[in-house]
Structure formats: C-alpha cells, structure tokens
Amino acid sequence: MYAKKFTGSDPQTVRTAAEIVALQRMKNRNDSDTDFSDDDEETSGGCPKMTPQEEQRMFEREQQIAFSGRCTIGDPESCHQLRTDINHRCGPRPSTSSNATWNILNRDVQRRNGPVMTSASRAHLLNTHLPNKKRRVDQLRTKNFCAQYIQNGRKMVVSSQGERENSFLSTKSGKIEISLPILSMQRTPCGPLQLVDLDTAVNQQGDLISYCTWKDAVYIGRMEQEDNQNITWFPIDWHGEHAVQNQCAVFCVRFSDDSEQIVCGTSEYSIHVFDVEQRRRIRTIVNAHEDDVNSVCFADYGSNLIYSAGDDGLVKVWDKRAWSDGDVIPVGVFAGHRDGVTYVDSRQDERYLLSNSKDQTIKVWDLRKFSCQGGVEATRACVQSQHWDYRWQPAPPGLCQPVQGDTSVMTLRGHSVLHTLVRAKFSPENTGRRFIYTGCARGEIVVYDIVTGTVSRRLKGHQAVVRECDWHPQENEIVSTSWDGVTTVWTWDERAEGVIAPYDHPNIHQFGDEDSCDELYQPIKKPQRKLRKPISARNAKCPTTSSEPDDFQI
C-alpha cells in the first residue's frame, strides 16, 4: 500500500509500507527461494521501521514513476473493425492544438442558429476537450469505494466505509449546468450491515439502491422522497433452492437495465440472480468460476447476456435464454490474463467488452471470438503459478509475457492494479465510446484512446488508490473516489492543459492542486495602508524650520 502524503498516517499504513520496502531486499538475499507468506519468520520480524519523512518520500517516488502506456494488438481484424466503428461515431482523431480548439469552438458558435450538431460532431468536440482539472466536492476520513452517476447525470452516488465501522451512501443531488459541481449533498445511512459494503449499485432511474456485504447479504433500498433522507431497506431472501450453508462475501452487484433483476458474484465461486420486485433468488450458478467472482454485469440493454469475471483469470458469458432448458453452462469463455480479473464492463453494443486484471493489463474482447480450451488451460496454469498478494505486495516481473491462446482484441498497459479491485470502463456514448478509463493504485485516473492505443489523459490528484471513477453520460465530466476519502469531479479547463500531459511530454509543466478555475480563485487582499504618525510625533523628531536656535548668529 502506498503511504499517504501526510505525516499523520496510521501505524498500520506505516507497517504495510515498510513490508513493501523489505520485499526487494528479501528477494536479493535469496532470489531462488523467496517466500512471502505470513508465517515467514524473516518477513514478520525483519521489516525496518519507517519514519514519517521516509514514508512521504516513498509515496512521492512511487507517484512519479513514469508510465508511458503501451498497446498490444492481438486480433488485427477485430481491432480494425472496432476503430472503424469509433471513427464512424466520432470522426477522426481529436486534435489538442489551440488553433484546432478555437476553430471547433467558432464553428460551434456559428451553428447555434443553424442545424443541430450531429452526434459525431458533438463527440468530436467533446473528445477534443477531455477532463483535465479537478474540483474536490467531498472529503471524509474513511475509504471511498464506489461512484456512479444516475438520472442522466443529475445526481451521483458515492459509497464509503463509515466513520465508526458503519457504512453509508453519500448522495449529491442538484441540477448540473455547464458541468458545474453538484450543489447540495446529503448523507444517507445504510440499513443493517455486516462489517462493510463491498459494492453499491443504483438503477438508471435513480430510485433503487442495492449494496452487498462481507456476509451473504444483499439489501435493496427504495428512495421514496426527493431529498433521499428516508430510505426503506429490504433484505433479499438469500435462502432458496440452493441455500448457502457457510457465510460468504458478496463482491459485486448490478441492476438490469429494466431494474427487474440484480445479479451478484460471491466468494463461493457462484453467481446469483434475484428478482427485485419479489426480493427472492430466481437462479444460482454454482461453481461458475474456480475462484472468487469479482465482477458481473449485464451485457446489453435486453439483459439476456451476463458477463462474469473472477480470480481464476477467466471471463465467462452466460445466456439467460438457455436457462429455461436447465442449461447453466457458459456460452463462451475468454482467456488470456495471467492473474485474476478485477472488473468486467460491456460496451453496450452486443459485441465488445473489457476486463481489468491484477496482471496490470486491460484486455478488450470480441464476443464473436471465444477462446479455445487450450487457451483456458494456459490461463489456468498461469494464474495458479502466481504466489503474490496484490493487496500489499508489488506486482512481480513476468506479468507482461503473453499467454498462449489469448484471443483478446487488444491489451492496454499503463496503470497499476493493487490493494483493491480497481475498475475500468468504456467511455459513454456521447464520446463515441472511444476511450477506456480506469482507476489506478497511484492515485490517478488513466484514460486510454482505443484508436491510437495511447494514454490520452492521466489525471493526478489523489493520495491513495482510486478504486472507481464514472464518466458523466452527457458532459465531459468524471467523478473519482479514492481511499484517501476524497471525492473529486474532473472537468475541462483550457488553462490547465499542462497538468494532464504524459510524463514524458517535453513541454510538461505543473500547476497547483486546484488553481486556474474562477470559482477557486482566492480574493486579492488589499494592501494595508501605512499609518501616518501624528503631527506632534513628527514635530518631535524633526524640528520645524520656523524655530531658530538661541545661538543663531548672523
């Protein structure tokens, strides 16, 4: 875990950071036989203590590590078709030059009284002005986990661990005009919990909230009032035909597009589908994966396909239409990661999806090209050969080596997946779904351009891992939540272009944390006026010219 950038870090953070520093020393001493298990005597007793100054320097050093980004094309044909679709949706590659920016803006102004801009022209304009400037909207003393825009971007929901081991949902509501920050804020306590919520989902209508916990429990809340102060929580009947005998963690929960069903993944390698109205389980897929199911989602607006991903390194596709015949085997499997998968997201076009993995890569998959059994076996062997824990150890070397039988369209590298289940997503429809954006263990948001295969934006502003970020469905605005307790909204500011340039950019320069925005300017203090001394004091110091000394002589 990267140490936080302040001297008041808790002792657990210091100890964890010290263990990370000791790992490389241990490897150098015994490179052929290194054991990082908890029962290792040298690991538990030989870690040096770090001072707050060393802790801060370590964090700054890790934060300055340059990631130029890299794209590997796995399927040239599918990649070409994907990029052609993007160019059709949003036009050619956006330019970042000032002349092109002003030309586009002038053209937009000239068309105000003319025909409405096409979706491709709008996407081209938005892609030229990607978010680059942060505004802090909330700060807590606990870790933030999830963030999601709802109701077409008029509201956002942020979930976090509570101050005293109680979880709560933070809902910020109010009209958004020209991507201005949300005006009001209410914090809504959750219902009955077991330890902490692991995932939070909100339907697109914004009237239903669901969260899951470390215990086999899923709750649904209905927001009945406009201010969201009173939420009625309903537990979902977890016991059914396949009752869970042991307590298990529910790592992920998602609503279907029609809000009639939710799907969950658990630590018992199973997938559960629930009916929202009846609040009961309607389908269980036992042993859906060979390890924890970290992520699930509905593939399309029809909600017939379900994607799932887990610590076995595989991404599986399930068709609900086949369940009526009792067939609960996946219709296809994607293999190619060298470690567990933390998140899966659909492009909502019934063709492409992505997966984020602990092997520090994002892979894009084509729904028409599943992996063969040889690729599945190769992935299984690679995952089983990993002996590191991403929660507190650095990523080992060798994760960049390709897996035989990998059928991914492309592989993106340039971000860090450590400490938690970091999430990656496709950008919304108003951008032509041109970009893939993800959180990062280095406190950043990394935005990849699918067409060029490069890092388009690297938004630095958090002091701890960014677990999830969400792109506004209508505006160029991204909300990010981090373990530093800060909720940040990113928008475009023409005066802050230097902040988001890649690390190796020749003209990179840095601004302050929150400068260059009008609403953040500090008022100029009027200089204090120098007080004049009284006449009597001045006369005492400097005698007047009218008085002559007694000994004056002509």
Curated annotation (Swiss-Prot):
Regions of compositional bias (Acidic residues) in chain numbering: 33-43
Gene Ontology BP annotations: determination of adult lifespan; proteasome-mediated ubiquitin-dependent protein catabolic process
Disordered: annotated span: 24-52, 527-554
One Gene Ontology cellular component: Cul4-RING E3 ubiquitin ligase complex
Record key words, sorted: Repeat, WD repeat
KW 4Fe-4S (keyword) present: no
Pfam families cross-referenced by the UniProt entry: WD40
Per-repeat ranges for WD: 245-284, 288-328, 336-375, 414-458, 461-500
Keyword GTP-binding: no
PANTHER family: DDB1- AND CUL4-ASSOCIATED FACTOR 11
Task of the protein: Involved in regulation of lifespan. Required for dopaminergic CEP neuron degeneration in response to Mn(2+).
Recorded family membership: Belongs to the WD repeat LEC14B family.
Name of this protein: DDB1- and CUL4-associated factor 11 homolog
Native source organism of the sequence: Caenorhabditis briggsae
Phylogenetic lineage: Eukaryota, Metazoa, Ecdysozoa, Nematoda, Chromadorea
Gene coding for it: wdr-23
